Protein backbone atom coordinates (compact mmCIF):
# COMPACT_ATOMS: atom_id res chain seq x y z
CA UNK A 1 0.00 0.00 0.00
CA UNK A 2 2.74 2.45 0.97
CA UNK A 3 4.75 1.40 -2.08
CA UNK A 4 1.84 2.31 -4.37
CA UNK A 5 1.82 5.86 -3.01
CA UNK A 6 5.59 6.36 -3.11
CA UNK A 7 6.27 4.66 -6.43
CA UNK A 8 3.54 6.62 -8.22
CA UNK A 9 4.54 10.02 -6.88
CA UNK A 10 5.97 12.01 -9.81
CA UNK A 11 8.10 14.08 -7.42
CA UNK A 12 10.01 10.95 -6.42
CA UNK A 13 10.41 9.47 -9.89
CA UNK A 14 14.00 8.35 -10.36
CA UNK A 15 14.85 9.26 -6.76
CA UNK A 16 13.10 6.82 -4.46
CA UNK A 17 11.38 3.47 -4.83
CA UNK A 18 9.93 1.18 -2.20
CA UNK A 19 10.20 -2.55 -2.86
CA UNK A 20 9.07 -5.46 -0.70
CA UNK A 21 11.09 -8.62 -1.30
CA UNK A 22 9.14 -11.73 -0.27
CA UNK A 23 10.63 -14.97 1.03
CA UNK A 24 13.83 -13.43 2.38
CA UNK A 25 16.56 -16.05 2.34
CA UNK A 26 20.31 -16.48 2.53
CA UNK A 27 20.52 -16.28 -1.26
CA UNK A 28 18.70 -12.95 -1.30
CA UNK A 29 20.75 -11.70 1.65
CA UNK A 30 23.91 -12.32 -0.36
CA UNK A 31 22.62 -9.77 -2.88
CA UNK A 32 20.99 -7.27 -0.52
CA UNK A 33 23.57 -6.95 2.26
CA UNK A 34 26.60 -5.95 0.12
CA UNK A 35 24.45 -3.37 -1.71
CA UNK A 36 22.98 -1.66 1.37
CA UNK A 37 23.91 1.83 2.52
CA UNK A 38 21.81 1.77 5.71
CA UNK A 39 20.92 -1.09 8.03
CA UNK A 40 17.82 -0.35 10.11
CA UNK A 41 17.78 -2.30 13.39
CA UNK A 42 14.78 -0.79 15.13
CA UNK A 43 13.61 -3.21 17.83
CA UNK A 44 12.65 -1.68 21.18
CA UNK A 45 15.65 -1.64 23.52
CA UNK A 46 15.74 -4.78 25.64
CA UNK A 47 13.32 -6.86 23.57
CA UNK A 48 15.38 -8.71 20.96
CA UNK A 49 17.95 -11.45 21.28
CA UNK A 50 21.21 -10.47 19.66
CA UNK A 51 21.08 -11.42 15.99
CA UNK A 52 23.83 -11.32 13.39
CA UNK A 53 22.27 -9.45 10.45
CA UNK A 54 23.40 -6.07 11.79
CA UNK A 55 26.97 -7.39 12.00
CA UNK A 56 26.81 -8.63 8.40
CA UNK A 57 25.56 -5.28 7.15
CA UNK A 58 28.23 -3.36 9.07
CA UNK A 59 30.97 -5.71 7.85
CA UNK A 60 29.86 -4.90 4.30
CA UNK A 61 29.98 -1.15 4.92
CA UNK A 62 26.36 -0.31 5.72
CA UNK A 63 25.85 2.19 8.52
CA UNK A 64 23.50 1.14 11.30
CA UNK A 65 20.40 3.13 12.21
CA UNK A 66 19.19 1.47 15.35
CA UNK A 67 18.18 1.37 18.97
CA UNK A 68 20.35 0.41 21.92
CA UNK A 69 19.31 -3.22 21.60
CA UNK A 70 21.10 -6.48 20.92
CA UNK A 71 24.41 -6.28 19.10
CA UNK A 72 23.75 -2.64 18.18
CA UNK A 73 25.24 -1.78 21.57
CA UNK A 74 28.46 -3.62 20.76
CA UNK A 75 28.62 -2.14 17.27
CA UNK A 76 28.36 1.31 18.87
CA UNK A 77 31.17 0.43 21.28
CA UNK A 78 33.42 -0.69 18.44
CA UNK A 79 32.77 1.86 15.68
CA UNK A 80 32.12 4.92 17.84
CA UNK A 81 29.02 7.12 18.02
CA UNK A 82 30.08 9.23 15.03
CA UNK A 83 29.82 6.18 12.74
CA UNK A 84 26.40 4.89 13.77
CA UNK A 85 22.94 6.45 14.14
CA UNK A 86 21.39 5.59 17.50
CA UNK A 87 17.85 6.57 18.45
CA UNK A 88 15.21 5.70 21.01
CA UNK A 89 15.01 5.06 24.72
CA UNK A 90 17.46 2.96 26.68
CA UNK A 91 16.41 -0.25 28.44
CA UNK A 92 16.21 1.69 31.70
CA UNK A 93 13.99 4.35 30.14
CA UNK A 94 11.75 1.70 28.57
CA UNK A 95 11.28 -0.03 31.92
CA UNK A 96 10.68 3.27 33.70
CA UNK A 97 7.93 4.16 31.22
CA UNK A 98 6.26 0.80 31.80
CA UNK A 99 6.45 1.13 35.56
CA UNK A 100 4.87 4.58 35.67
CA UNK A 101 2.22 3.63 33.11
CA UNK A 102 3.06 4.23 29.46
CA UNK A 103 0.42 6.32 27.69
CA UNK A 104 1.04 6.36 23.91
CA UNK A 105 -1.74 8.90 23.38
CA UNK A 106 0.42 11.56 25.03
CA UNK A 107 3.02 11.25 22.27
CA UNK A 108 0.37 11.13 19.56
CA UNK A 109 -1.29 14.29 20.86
CA UNK A 110 1.91 16.29 21.45
CA UNK A 111 3.77 15.56 18.18
CA UNK A 112 2.14 17.18 15.15
CA UNK A 113 4.07 15.08 12.64
CA UNK A 114 3.21 11.84 14.45
CA UNK A 115 -0.40 12.98 14.60
CA UNK A 116 -0.40 13.41 10.82
CA UNK A 117 1.11 9.95 10.31
CA UNK A 118 -1.50 8.23 12.46
CA UNK A 119 -4.20 10.39 10.89
CA UNK A 120 -3.17 9.31 7.39
CA UNK A 121 -3.47 5.65 8.39
CA UNK A 122 -6.84 6.20 10.06
CA UNK A 123 -8.16 8.07 7.01
CA UNK A 124 -7.15 5.25 4.67
CA UNK A 125 -4.59 7.28 2.71
CA UNK A 126 -2.61 4.15 1.89
CA UNK A 127 -5.64 1.92 1.32
CA UNK A 128 -8.45 4.06 -0.15
CA UNK A 129 -10.28 0.96 -1.39
CA UNK A 130 -10.31 -0.40 2.18
CA UNK A 131 -10.08 2.54 4.63
CA UNK A 132 -10.43 0.30 7.69
CA UNK A 133 -7.51 -1.94 6.76
CA UNK A 134 -5.16 -0.52 9.38
CA UNK A 135 -7.69 -0.03 12.17
CA UNK A 136 -6.15 -2.74 14.36
CA UNK A 137 -2.70 -1.21 13.90
CA UNK A 138 -3.72 2.36 14.64
CA UNK A 139 -5.81 1.42 17.67
CA UNK A 140 -2.95 -0.66 19.04
CA UNK A 141 -0.51 2.21 18.57
CA UNK A 142 -2.79 4.79 20.17
CA UNK A 143 -4.08 2.76 23.11
CA UNK A 144 -1.55 0.00 23.81
CA UNK A 145 1.75 0.18 21.87
CA UNK A 146 3.60 -2.47 23.87
CA UNK A 147 6.80 -1.82 21.90
CA UNK A 148 6.63 1.92 22.57
CA UNK A 149 6.88 2.89 18.90
CA UNK A 150 5.30 6.27 19.53
CA UNK A 151 7.75 7.02 22.34
CA UNK A 152 10.67 6.41 19.96
CA UNK A 153 9.10 8.13 16.93
CA UNK A 154 10.57 11.61 17.35
CA UNK A 155 14.04 10.29 18.08
CA UNK A 156 13.81 8.06 14.98
CA UNK A 157 12.83 10.99 12.74
CA UNK A 158 15.71 13.06 14.13
CA UNK A 159 18.14 10.18 13.49
CA UNK A 160 16.92 9.93 9.89
CA UNK A 161 17.70 13.62 9.47
CA UNK A 162 21.26 12.90 10.59
CA UNK A 163 21.47 10.10 8.04
CA UNK A 164 20.40 12.51 5.29
CA UNK A 165 22.92 15.11 6.41
CA UNK A 166 25.85 12.69 6.47
CA UNK A 167 24.86 11.12 3.14
CA UNK A 168 25.26 14.53 1.49
CA UNK A 169 28.92 14.55 2.56
CA UNK A 170 30.54 11.81 0.49
CA UNK A 171 33.87 11.90 2.35
CA UNK A 172 32.27 11.59 5.79
CA UNK A 173 29.99 8.80 4.63
CA UNK A 174 32.87 6.83 3.13
CA UNK A 175 34.92 7.35 6.29
CA UNK A 176 32.08 5.93 8.40
CA UNK A 177 31.72 3.02 6.00
CA UNK A 178 35.42 2.19 6.32
CA UNK A 179 35.30 2.51 10.11
CA UNK A 180 32.44 0.02 10.24
CA UNK A 181 34.27 -2.49 8.06
CA UNK A 182 37.59 -2.37 9.89
CA UNK A 183 36.05 -2.51 13.36
CA UNK A 184 33.89 -5.58 12.81
CA UNK A 185 36.76 -7.89 13.73
CA UNK A 186 35.34 -7.91 17.25
CA UNK A 187 32.52 -10.12 15.99
CA UNK A 188 34.78 -12.83 14.57
CA UNK A 189 33.94 -16.40 15.53
CA UNK A 190 37.54 -16.87 16.74
CA UNK A 191 37.14 -14.16 19.39
CA UNK A 192 33.70 -15.41 20.37
CA UNK A 193 34.77 -19.02 20.81
CA UNK A 194 37.87 -18.00 22.76
CA UNK A 195 35.75 -15.96 25.19
CA UNK A 196 33.28 -18.83 25.58
CA UNK A 197 36.15 -21.21 26.26
CA UNK A 198 37.72 -18.90 28.85
CA UNK A 199 34.66 -17.45 30.57
CA UNK A 200 31.86 -20.00 30.20
CA UNK A 201 33.21 -23.44 29.41
CA UNK A 202 36.41 -22.92 31.45
CA UNK A 203 38.39 -25.18 29.13
CA UNK A 204 42.00 -25.07 27.99
CA UNK A 205 43.49 -26.21 24.68
CA UNK A 206 44.99 -29.69 24.65
CA UNK A 207 48.66 -30.10 23.88
CA UNK A 208 49.42 -31.77 20.56
CA UNK A 209 52.90 -32.78 21.72
CA UNK A 210 53.39 -36.52 22.04
Task: Tell me what each language-model feature is.
Residues 1-26:
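Nucleotide-activated donor-binding/catalytic signature segment of Leloir-type glycosyltransferases, i.e.
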Residues 33-36, 42-177, 181-186, 191, ...:
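Catalytic binding pocket for nucleotide-activated donors in carbohydrate/polymer assembly enzymes
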Residues 30:
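An anionic, turn-rich surface loop/hairpin at beta-sheet edges
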Residues 14-15, 39-41:
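Short, basic, glycine/proline-bearing loop/turn elements
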Residues 23-27, 46-49:
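Short acidic loop-to-helix transition motifs that present clustered carboxylates
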Amino acid sequence: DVANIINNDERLKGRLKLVFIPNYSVSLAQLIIPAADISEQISLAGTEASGTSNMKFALNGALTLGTLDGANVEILDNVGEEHIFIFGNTVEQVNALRQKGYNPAEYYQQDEQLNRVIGALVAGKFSPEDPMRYTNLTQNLQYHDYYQSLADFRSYVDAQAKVDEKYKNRDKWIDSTIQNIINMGFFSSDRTIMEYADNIWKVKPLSTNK
